[in-house]
Amino acid sequence: MGVAYEVGQVSGFAGPATVFRLDPTLAGHEFVTVWVQDVFGAQGPEAVVVAAVDASGAAKSMTRLPGSYVAAAPTVSGALWLNGYQISR
């Protein structure tokens, strides 16, 4: 199982966001930003994973990476787990 090292919290996303450094990388990305956003219109709550430029957490693109999912109670750890990572603080 891979490891997602928590780098820190960032703002500017649709919910409280956390930056992680991944080992091994996910789709070639060492850093990702992950957050959970509330219901938006007809879509339920969503855990979102996007590629980050670096440890700053700035998104390279808002295109969702694998692990993003919609569920009744999504979690950041669930999104990382879907990709085979466990969180290390």
Label the predicted regions.
Residues 28-60:
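A short, structured beta-strand/loop element
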Residues 25, 29, 34, 68, ...:
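Low-complexity, intrinsically disordered/propeptide-like segments
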Residues 51-89:
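Mixed-charge, Lys/Arg-enriched low-complexity segments
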Residues 5, 16, 31, 73-74, ...:
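A detector of low-complexity, intrinsically disordered, Ser/Thr/Gly/Pro/Ala-rich segments
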Residues 1-27:
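Negatively charged, low-complexity tracts enriched in Asp/Glu with abundant Ser/Thr
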